[in-house]
Regions:
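Charged/polar interaction segments and conserved charged motifs
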Residues: 8-36
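Catalytic phosphate/metal-binding cores of nucleic-acid and nucleotide-processing enzymes, i.e., regions
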Residues: 45
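Blade/loop signatures of beta-propeller domains
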Residues: 25-41, 77-85
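Helix-loop-helix junctions within predominantly alpha-helical proteins
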Residues: 48-50
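Beta-sheet-dominated scaffold domains
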Residues: 3-7, 14-20, 53-214
Length: 214
């Protein structure tokens, strides 16, 4: 179905949150919502922005009935307050000095979410959102070193997924490149929790270094 409403703006990401479809604009400046339970209908006044440290919006995720708007360097959390007009309100104090480096690199995982990113002037790592105001790095030095071999443009196309097998939970992060071997790094959340250290391994397709193909 094509969206024909004149108030719809070009968008890169979308989430469903309490009856609303929440979009972020391609220019990374604003977020806007559909009418309640009407995904094809929009009001030009139903928009907002990240305000604590308004960097460019990269992606978003709904977790624990809250909407996290993840910028290039920071993350702000919104809740649905209903009422007339724009229904989302920033939660006071729910602010993290870490952002996303790829719009495809955030995934729900083990009662929270993981993301590919970092803070201002930081190199790319992989993080776990520990609370509404704190992110904890889960990638170790070896994984970080391998990630740094990819360019910013390549990292911007990196993507993630999660799965469980035999009672263990895994998050998969794939970085593709035409210059160097592509890589797929796997975080074992269950083993990490039991050992107290981040446990990583790698998936490959074929006999040579290559990213994993599902």
């Amino acid at each position: 179905t094509q969206i024909t409403d004149a108030d719809f703006q070009t968008s890169d990401t979308v989430s469903f949150y309490r009856g609303f479809f929440v979009f972020t604009t391609t220019d990374g400046k604003r977020l806007f919502v559909s009418n309640l339970n009407q995904p094809l209908v929009f009001d030009g006044l139903d928009f907002g922005s990240a305000e604590g440290d308004p960097d460019r919006i990269i992606t978003q995720i709904v977790d624990h009935d809250e909407l996290s708007i993840i910028g290039a360097e920071t993350t702000e959390v919104f809740r649905n307050v209903g009422g007339v007009g724009f229904p989302l309100q920033i939660i006071s104090g729910a602010f993290t000095q870490k952002g996303a480096h790829t719009k495809y690199g955030v995934v729900k995982f083990d009662n929270t979410y993981l993301f590919i990113g970092g803070g201002e002037n930081e190199l790319t790592s992989i993080w776990r959102q520990a609370s509404s105001s704190q992110a904890v790095k889960v990638s170790d030095d070896a994984i970080d070193s391998e990630i740094q071999k990819f360019t910013a443009e390549e990292i911007a196309e990196a993507f993630t997924m999660s799965f469980s097998k035999k009672g263990q939970f895994f998050a998969v992060f794939t970085f593709n490149s035409a210059r160097i071997p592509s890589r797929t790094f796997v975080y074992n959340g269950t083993a990490s929790a039991l050992s107290g250290n981040s446990v990583w391994f790698e998936f490959q397709t074929g006999l040579t270094n290559a990213s994993w193909r599902v």
